[in-house]
Structures are given as structure tokens and as C-alpha cells.
């Protein structure tokens, strides 16, 4: 997936004093080439030309942005250690950059370092109190850590900033589901599905879980079926369908779905734990 890095490269171009300077500068020529490689998702070559640009002008004032782009290119290659080091370096140069903090936080999420992601998102919310995405993730991590009051505060701020944002809808749905308010959660998930051009299997999965909790089995079946059409190898969906079949007292169908869940990566013990 091409991440939002081209725009930052263009920002660097705009800061050049003139087109003649850019044409004569190896630094900007390397950046030009890196941008072309990024558009083609040739991450290895993009990394090479960004490194050449940094070597050409190691003291250039734009390098914090360029180093951030280098980190993102490395992240796309799953070079997580190098990427993290370069986000750290870029932030040492521009510690109050919201973009850099969000990029590093996103990487921390990707490598499941939730505490570090939480701290970066918290820094962003202090720098920009209207940043919806960061407040959403800050609240979501708080919820996962059991900090219900923090999550409620974050998600309440989302309602204040933009009650119609998909982040707000998903935040409220997740909160209500966690609190056991399944009817309310279903309403928020339904709003979110209406907002999505193509409903994600993840949203359908979550709403199906809520339907199962209140034993609306036909509705749960519909969501599970639609989710499986989008993600047929998602093991947990077969666990949900096994649970549905258990509630319908269909042990043969339940066992079939347990076997499918095992096939796609969930152990039998884990499947039975979720079905109970």
C-alpha cells in the first residue's frame, strides 16, 4: 500500500529557492527519482535514492521530512527496526511534528507496541486537540488497557469534534460493546455500515457478535455470511458461525465450523473458549 508520503516529498520541492536550483542540485534530483520509485511501489530503490539525497546534503533543513519518508519506505519493506530508528531521528530534529508522531504511533501499532503508540498519540492530542484519528486510537488503546474513564473522555471529545465521523461512530460502537450495551453498539455499527461504500468485514463481524449476544440469530447469520464473502479465510468468522450453530442446537454444523476455524489458524481450545 502506498502511504501518504508523496505529499511530503512535494513539500520539500516547494521549499527549494528556484527551479534552477532544484535542477542543479543532486539532492533534489535524488528526491525526484525517489518519488518516481515510490509511485511504482519500488520501495528498495526509493530507499536507495532517499539515502543518496541525505548523503548529498546531510545538513539540509528539510531532512527531518526526508528521514520520515525514508522510515515509511522501510516500513513498507517490513524493516521495522530501521524504520523506527529513522522516525526517532526525524522526531529528534522536529519533536513537535504531528505528522511524524502519528507515523511513529502507527508503526508502533503495527508491531503491537501499544504503550509506545499510546504515548505518541497522547502527545498528538496535546499538540492538536482536534485531531480525530489520534484521539480515536488513544481511546481505543486505553479501552484495551482497561482504562474505561480515559476511553470515555477521548470518545466524548470525538462526539464534540465531529459526531458524524466514522472514527466517532466506531469508537462509540466499540465502547458500548465493551460495556455490554449491545443494542446501542448495534446502532453505531449500523450507522458506520451505512457510511461505508462497501461495508468492511471487520464491522460486520463486530455487529454479528452483538447480535449473537442478544440472540438475534437471523441478523447475526446475515452479517456473518456477508463478512465471509469478503474474508473467507478469516478464522474467527467460522468461530462466530459455530457459536451461532450452537445457539441453534446444530452440533454437526457447529463442529464443521470449528474444523474450518482450525484450518484457518485458530486452535480448537481457543475456538471452544470463544464459543462458550
Where are these predicted regions, by residue range?
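Register position in tetratricopeptide repeats
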Residues: 39-40, 73-76, 110-111, 144-145, ...
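Canonical positions in the second alpha-helix
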Residues: 53, 89-90, 123-124, 157-158, ...
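Canonical tetratricopeptide repeat
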Residues: 65-69, 103, 137, 171, ...
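Helix-start (N-cap) detector for alpha-helical repeat units in TPR-like alpha-solenoids
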Residues: 27-28, 61-64, 98-99, 132-133, ...
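Terminal, low-structured helical/coil segments at or just beyond the last alpha-helical repeat
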Residues: 239-276
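N-terminal leader/linker segments that initiate helical-solenoid repeat arrays
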Residues: 20-67, 76
